[in-house]
Amino acid sequence: MGFDEKLFNKELAGLARKFQVSPKSCNNPEYYNEYIRYSAIGDQQKGVGVTHVLVDTESERIAGYVTLRATSLVSEGENHVKLVEPSLEIAELAVDAEFERQGIGSALIGIAIDVADELRKNYLGIRHLVVCADGSAIDFYKKLGFGELSTLYEVLHDGWNDHCDPLYITLPENITNFDP
């Protein structure tokens, strides 16, 4: 079984109809099903986020997706001055029920790290990879090296991420191939 990484677009939108997150894998599976079907392309067009998908080459099904967007971690400096550290946020990440426990989630994190590395090397500063995790996914992220935000940092909130647990990983200066 092989997978192709692709940017989600209108040509791939038809594949999203079959995408189905298992109710056992997260607290709100219908949200993730609906996001890839109805919101991902609009978010890309509005500049809100970019969605990457892994497509199973055999079945031509979307095995999983990750949506990335720019954000900042905010901390407080001397004299209560707000300091921001540029970050890349995993805004959405989901794996189809048929492809669970096959390394798809880790591969999607690898895509996010590769994008962060490309941005940092060639376009803009990125210090952290941030995710506001569904409560049922915290252990998954922690196994990959993500930690809870210390009291020094806060994630910018925009309403959608109020009921999640913010986690982050500081990216090393020289990222090599991510291997979970």
Give the positions of each predicted feature:
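Non-catalytic substrate-recognition and accessory regions of acyl/acetyltransferase enzymes
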Residues: M1-Q102, G110-V130, D134, I138-P180
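Residues forming the Rossmann-fold NAD(P)(H) cofactor-binding site
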Residues: S106
